[in-house]
Amino acid sequence: MEEENATLLTEFVLTGFLYQPQWKIPLFLAFLVIYLITIMGNLGLIAVIWKDPHLHIPMYLLLGNLAFVDAWISSTVTPKMLNNFLAKSKMISLSECKIQFFSFAISVTTECFLLATMAYDRYVAICKPLLYPAIMTNGLCIRLLILSYVGGILHALIHEGFLFRLTFCNSNIVHHIYCDTIPLSKISCTDSSINFLMVFIFSGSIQVFSIVTILVSYTFVLFAILKKKSDKGVRKAFSTCGAHLFSVSLYYGPLLFIYVGPASPQADDQDMVEPLFYTVIIPLLNPIIYSLRNKQVTVSFTKMLKKHVKVSY
């Protein structure tokens, strides 16, 4: 009865890092620089792959889509966070909040599937090199990409549907850097236990599936590498695989902790720091880890750069 008589809230305050006003300008400048580098790096990678016909193969199609999704994740979260550093009003409407969460859920879930697909691609390329052209065709790659995006959309729709059942009447303070189902469920005056359960079941299943796929694929890859006789080749392959696994661990570690681990009833500072790994840091690092270490990408980028410099002069 109290819930029915209460005034329903339709606007929220995203606190973000605003509880430390003395850091407002330095944090704004830091995140702005990171965001600009992230967008330029990922869009630059997409342009290189798009322009060079030699890179129109599964490995680079997957890499280009990873760059697109990284730019998407960063653009979903960072602009609003930057605005909140400087704007007098930190409000976000309920509809805008739901749109931001929907975009975030699609992009993050799609990246989970993409990382698993990329690990499988590396497994086939290294463990079955002679069969690679027959197994990992462009047609199969495109189908896997479509499945990744469809999986992301369906997963987002599930949580968006359960988000619509929530009502808010007690507090409009969201202690987070973006609108997410868990912090919103914590301040809802509707019973949100089903929302937490859906997050655990669906988010947990997707993360476990993709992590297992990645670990199994790279385990076979590492065994295949150890059979090689070239010390230089082994060191290079270990370095590349290590960098990839480092990126994956930074991405999945916070995701598992937030969406699969037990949810604390009260918000704390960790709720804002951990999401920075998969919304800000990983989109910045992925172009470096997956591209600058790749000879074909760097050669194509150099050629494109030289061509544009000649045209400008």
UniProtKB/Swiss-Prot annotation:
GO molecular function: G protein-coupled receptor activity; odorant binding; olfactory receptor activity
Principal subcellular localisation of the protein: membrane
Compartments, as annotated in UniProt: Cell membrane
Pfam families reported in the protein's UniProt record: 7tm_4
Glycan attachment points: 5
Topology versus the membrane: Multi-pass membrane protein
Topological domain ranges for the Cytoplasmic compartment: 50-56, 120-143, 217-240, 293-313
Gene3D superfamilies named among the record's database cross-references: Rhodopsin 7-helix transmembrane proteins (1.20.1070.10)
Transmembrane segments: 29-49, 57-77, 99-119, 144-164, 196-216, 241-261, 272-292
One annotated Gene Ontology cellular component of this protein: plasma membrane
InterPro entries assigned: GPCR_Rhodpsn, GPCR_Rhodpsn_7TM, Olfact_rcpt
Keywords from the named record: Cell membrane, Disulfide bond, G-protein coupled receptor, Glycoprotein, Membrane, Olfaction, Receptor, Sensory transduction, Transducer, Transmembrane, Transmembrane helix
Role played: Odorant receptor.
Family affiliation: Belongs to the G-protein coupled receptor 1 family.
Protein name as it appears in the record: Olfactory receptor 5H1
Designated gene of the protein: OR5H1
